Amino acid sequence: MHPVDKKSLALKIYEATGYQFRDLDLLLEALTHPSLSYKSAANYERLEFLGDAVLSMTVSEMLYRLFPDDDEGCLTRKRTALVRGSEVVEIARSIGLGELILMSGGERTCGGSDNPGTLENALEALIGAMYMDGGPEAYRSFIHKHWLARAQHMSYTPPQDPKTALQEWVQGRGWAMPLYKLVSKSGPEHKPVFAVEVSIQEHGNVLGTGSSKKLAEQEAAKLMLKKITELP
């Protein structure tokens, strides 16, 4: 990996997001793809974990204020629709994030800079980095800029996604909450296959696969719903 001009990278991110990073090492971590991971170099996966939670929390608060008459189920479905992968990817593409992600030459040649999973992960990592670098005002400004209009135009309640439907199903029957476990990740970096197992106490487990961990969880939830609703 060639040395990275951190100041130039920070300027490009400022132009794309409106946020000026102070900790350039944190920014570098947020934009580093796992294909460049070494023992001495961090990638965006930990910050992605944080950013996913920050995005969900901020959008939840946004919806709570925008729709005072919605019940929990409606708010949950709206939040799921707003933070799903396709929405995050669309926003990542709109700010040109793909070209700023640091990855191996082979990964870029295989289309890694426009890979939906990579774009989703990197944008969530960037939001996590904003949180760590500048606190609430840093990430809220960015999230509101890109998600508020989308939320305001949600005049309907989206249909339930499988994970939400499964959760509400088991809660309504007093069952233990579903547990999701990543079983494996296979395939090349530019086209990974994730396998996730969902289990419900006394009702066994079901395996789902997908091109991202989130999609695999949704597939597993869908299959589990089918299994338990067919019980006598």
Swiss-Prot record:
<comment type="similarity">
    <text>Belongs to the ribonuclease III family.</text>
</comment>
<dbReference type="InterPro" id="IPR011907">
    <property type="entry name" value="RNase_III"/>
</dbReference>
<keyword id="KW-0479">Metal-binding</keyword>
<keyword id="KW-0507">mRNA processing</keyword>
<feature type="domain" description="DRBM">
    <location>
        <begin position="161"/>
        <end position="230"/>
    </location>
</feature>
<feature type="binding site">
    <location>
        <position position="124"/>
    </location>
    <ligand>
        <name>Mg(2+)</name>
    </ligand>
</feature>
<feature type="binding site">
    <location>
        <position position="48"/>
    </location>
    <ligand>
        <name>Mg(2+)</name>
    </ligand>
</feature>
<dbReference type="GO" id="GO:0046872">
    <property type="term" value="F:metal ion binding"/>
</dbReference>
<keyword id="KW-0694">RNA-binding</keyword>
<dbReference type="GO" id="GO:0010468">
    <property type="term" value="P:regulation of gene expression"/>
</dbReference>
<protein>
    <recommendedName>
        <fullName>Ribonuclease 3</fullName>
        <ecNumber>3.1.26.3</ecNumber>
    </recommendedName>
</protein>
<dbReference type="Pfam" id="PF14622">
    <property type="entry name" value="Ribonucleas_3_3"/>
</dbReference>
<keyword id="KW-0963">Cytoplasm</keyword>
<keyword id="KW-0819">tRNA processing</keyword>
<dbReference type="GO" id="GO:0005737">
    <property type="term" value="C:cytoplasm"/>
</dbReference>
<dbReference type="InterPro" id="IPR036389">
    <property type="entry name" value="RNase_III_sf"/>
</dbReference>
<comment type="function">
    <text>Digests double-stranded RNA. Involved in the processing of primary rRNA transcript to yield the immediate precursors to the large and small rRNAs (23S and 16S). Processes some mRNAs, and tRNAs when they are encoded in the rRNA operon. Processes pre-crRNA and tracrRNA of type II CRISPR loci if present in the organism.</text>
</comment>
<keyword id="KW-0378">Hydrolase</keyword>
<feature type="binding site">
    <location>
        <position position="121"/>
    </location>
    <ligand>
        <name>Mg(2+)</name>
    </ligand>
</feature>
<dbReference type="GO" id="GO:0019843">
    <property type="term" value="F:rRNA binding"/>
</dbReference>
<dbReference type="GO" id="GO:0003725">
    <property type="term" value="F:double-stranded RNA binding"/>
</dbReference>
<dbReference type="GO" id="GO:0006397">
    <property type="term" value="P:mRNA processing"/>
</dbReference>
<dbReference type="InterPro" id="IPR014720">
    <property type="entry name" value="dsRBD_dom"/>
</dbReference>
<dbReference type="GO" id="GO:0006364">
    <property type="term" value="P:rRNA processing"/>
</dbReference>
<dbReference type="GO" id="GO:0004525">
    <property type="term" value="F:ribonuclease III activity"/>
</dbReference>
<dbReference type="GO" id="GO:0008033">
    <property type="term" value="P:tRNA processing"/>
</dbReference>
<keyword id="KW-0540">Nuclease</keyword>
<keyword id="KW-0255">Endonuclease</keyword>
<feature type="domain" description="RNase III">
    <location>
        <begin position="10"/>
        <end position="135"/>
    </location>
</feature>
<dbReference type="InterPro" id="IPR000999">
    <property type="entry name" value="RNase_III_dom"/>
</dbReference>
<dbReference type="Pfam" id="PF00035">
    <property type="entry name" value="dsrm"/>
</dbReference>
<comment type="subunit">
    <text>Homodimer.</text>
</comment>
<feature type="active site">
    <location>
        <position position="124"/>
    </location>
</feature>
<keyword id="KW-0698">rRNA processing</keyword>
<keyword id="KW-0460">Magnesium</keyword>
<feature type="active site">
    <location>
        <position position="52"/>
    </location>
</feature>
<keyword id="KW-0699">rRNA-binding</keyword>
